[in-house]
Curated annotation (Swiss-Prot):
Required for disulfide bond formation in some periplasmic proteins. Acts by oxidizing the DsbA protein. Disulfide bonds join 38-41, 104-131. It is a multi-pass membrane protein. Residues 29-46, 89-145 are periplasmic. The chain crosses the membrane at residues 12-28, 47-63, 71-88, 146-164. InterPro entries: DiS_bond_form_DsbB/BdbC, Disulphide_bond_form_DsbB, DsbB, DsbB-like_sf. This is Disulfide bond formation protein B. HAMAP family: DsbB. The lineage of its organism: Bacteria, Pseudomonadati, Pseudomonadota, Gammaproteobacteria, Lysobacterales. Gene3D superfamilies: DsbB-like (1.20.1550.10). It comes from Xanthomonas campestris pv. campestris (strain ATCC 33913 / DSM 3586 / NCPPB 528 / LMG 568 / P 25). Residues 1-11, 64-70, 165-172 are cytoplasmic. It is found in: Cell inner membrane. GO terms for biological process: protein folding.
Length: 172
């Protein structure tokens, strides 16, 4: 079965399942392997969850018109783009020389209790926290690098599914 030939709903359902699988693996790594997520990791999870929600809504709605499919494709692409930006920042923090790293910041729970949401977002993206540590690798890539690969792939998948030309529906 070639997923490039599937209908919009099936393609968006596949995108949802990919995001759900990635989130499930992140929770597994946290709970069973004992790797605590840094603030940037948590923001990437939020981006994957947002992307999963958009894929699921698109799959459940299954708009008949090209405009609706394109809207879902663009919204999912934007969510993946935000995730790509966060993952890129995380990769940049990880590849910086250790002597250029600033001290670890407070945990996200403390930040959310003492600051507003926009200040927390700005602080997390400008600080490093524990985000410079590389505790996990697969095929030589760290988890934020893999997140970036997945965000790119899912962004392209959303655009493909949303903008694919679909001929008139045939009954048989």
């Amino acid at each position: 079965m070639n997923p490039f030939r599937w209908g919009f709903r099936a393609q968006f359902l596949l995108g949802f399942l990919a995001c759900a699988g990635l989130l499930a693996y992140a929770i597994y790594v946290q709970l069973h392997l004992g790797l605590e997520p840094c603030p940037l990791c948590i923001f990437q999870r939020i981006a994957f969850a947002t992307l999963a929600l958009l894929f699921l809504l698109g799959a459940l709605h299954g708009p008949r018109g090209a405009g609706g499919r394109k809207a879902y494709g663009v919204l999912a692409f934007i969510a993946a783009g935000v995730g790509m930006g966060i993952a890129a920042r995380h990769v940049w923090v990880q590849i910086r020389p250790k002597d250029m790293m600033s001290s670890c910041g407070p945990p996200l729970s403390f930040l959310s209790e003492t600051m507003g949401p926009f200040e927390v977002f700005r602080t997390v993206l400008t600080g490093t926290g524990d985000c410079g540590n590389i505790d996990w690798r697969f095929l030589g890539l760290s988890m934020p690098m893999w997140s970036m690969v997945w965000f790119v792939g899912l962004a392209l998948w959303a655009l493909y599914a949303g903008f694919k030309h679909r001929g008139p529906r045939k009954l048989f």
